[in-house]
Amino acid sequence: MQIAVIGLSHRTAPVEIRERVSIAEGQVPEYVSRLRSCSQVAECAILSTCNRLEIYTVLRDSEHGLREVTRFLAESKGVLLPTLQRHLFVLLHQDAVMHLMRVAAGLDSIVLGEGQILAQVKMTQSLAQQGKGVDRVLNQLFKTAITAGKRVRSDTNIGTGAVSVSSAAVEMALRKKGPLHNQRCLVVGAGKMGELLVRHLLAKGARQIIVLNRSLEKAAQMVEQFGLMLPVATVDELTNYVPCSDLIFTCTGATEPLLTLEKMSSLRRDQSLMIFDIAVPRNVATEVDELPNVQLFNVDHLKQVVEENRAYRQLMVTQCEEILLEQLDEFLDWWRGLEAVPTINQLRQKVETIREQELEKALSRLGTEFAEKHQGIIDSLTRAIVNKILHDPMVQLRAQRDIEARRRALQTLQTLFNLEAQSNPEPPTL
């Protein structure tokens, strides 16, 4: 059995290819079930996001299995095999394990340390379980990766500090204005950037948010996903909203400025306004910054914040890698211990058979009335004794890192208890 991951990501494939192989969340269990039926696939799980499509597998034979999985992906998504192969990456054994942990920790994301991917990894395991694609190995692998992702976020500061322009705008507003819960925020634009702005504003405590967009319907659809009754209006009403705003964020695709000196005429003299223009081309005319009660920040101002935070996060990567190596060792100890499982199961089965036979003899001697009254207690007692006697030897067998020492112990166990010699699975070459 070999652990492998085969897939593509923002590092290996352009969006045109990624969108062609993307699998909607609701379809993942079906794809998992179909892939699981391939002859060389013992277990599988599919991680599909806007930035990656990765198939985690336990293969009976790595060479034939990888060909089988690649062919399955190409045929099921209607992509020519040579086209797909140009963008695929393959990782085996320890590299595959470490890759999933890096993904869960956000170290392989466009935005270093971003938190959404951990939830997506959790969902991947859940969807694979629905499709009956995962068993002992991948369940343990995902459990370890999720633990690693949680530890990285709780034990380091990798997830702090803005590393996107939209989050940098909100962070700068928070620094300069203080708490956002009483700030009147105006977001102009309901595209992806506008959605991110609203998301970051809500995360930082803002509650008074109005969204403007050319299409009122699109603005309404965008705010609906947040489950809040946020007001929406059209960009044509921008002038009306300027005097009742403390913070304005612009992020439309307009080719000409939306906010000019003329449209700022409604600004009150006693009003202090901060504007964050994160659009390219810019949505706010340069001369607006000349107004005494206006502070204007554009993308270039915000990039400095982004780069400072990115450099800081990069320093955190070494600390994160140390955590991942600890989790990797933990998983590899578990994986190596699988070699002992068949012998352990056989021993447990033999001991349990003896326990049941002797229990039956004892109860028959005690008489029907006593047996019926106390059978449950005696059964629990004998079961507890067996479990306690076997516990330490079983733990020590699994924990033995020296492969040859473990195999000698297994052979001794088989000889002493007259067990059949097991064809134990070989651990991967690490």
Curated annotation (Swiss-Prot):
Pfam families: GlutR_dimer (PF00745), GlutR_N (PF05201), Shikimate_DH (PF01488). Its EC number is 1.2.1.70. InterPro entries: 4pyrrol_synth_GluRdtase, 4pyrrol_synth_GluRdtase_dimer, 4pyrrol_synth_GluRdtase_N, GluRdtase_CS, GluRdtase_dimer_dom_sf, GluRdtase_N_sf, NAD(P)-bd_dom_sf, Shikm_DH/Glu-tRNA_Rdtase. SUPFAM superfamilies: Glutamyl tRNA-reductase catalytic, N-terminal domain, Glutamyl tRNA-reductase dimerization domain, NAD(P)-binding Rossmann-fold domains. Coiled coil: none annotated. It catalyses: (S)-4-amino-5-oxopentanoate + tRNA(Glu) + NADP(+) = L-glutamyl-tRNA(Glu) + NADPH + H(+). NADP(+) binds at G189, A190, G191, K192, M193, G194. Pathway: Porphyrin-containing compound metabolism; protoporphyrin-IX biosynthesis; 5-aminolevulinate from L-glutamyl-tRNA(Glu): step 1/2; Porphyrin-containing compound metabolism; chlorophyll biosynthesis. The active site is at C50. Transmembrane segments: none annotated. Gene3D superfamilies: Glutamyl-tRNA reductase, N-terminal domain (3.30.460.30), NAD(P)-binding Rossmann-like Domain (3.40.50.720). It is an enzyme of class 1 (oxidoreductase). Substrate binds at T49, C50, N51, R52, S109, E114, G115, Q116, Q120. The keyword Ubl conjugation does not apply. One of its GO terms (biological process) is protoporphyrinogen IX biosynthetic process. Keywords: Chlorophyll biosynthesis, NADP, Oxidoreductase, Porphyrin biosynthesis. The record marks H99 as: Important for activity. NCBIfam families: hemA, PRK00045.1-3. HAMAP family: Glu_tRNA_reductase. Belongs to the glutamyl-tRNA reductase family. Possesses an unusual extended V-shaped dimeric structure with each monomer consisting of three distinct domains arranged along a curved 'spinal' alpha-helix. The N-terminal catalytic domain specifically recognizes the glutamate moiety of the substrate. The second domain is the NADPH-binding domain, and the third C-terminal domain is responsible for dimerization. During catalysis, the active site Cys acts as a nucleophile attacking the alpha-carbonyl group of tRNA-bound glutamate with the formation of a thioester intermediate between enzyme and glutamate, and the concomitant release of tRNA(Glu). The thioester intermediate is finally reduced by direct hydride transfer from NADPH, to form the product GSA. This is Glutamyl-tRNA reductase. It comes from Gloeobacter violaceus (strain ATCC 29082 / PCC 7421).
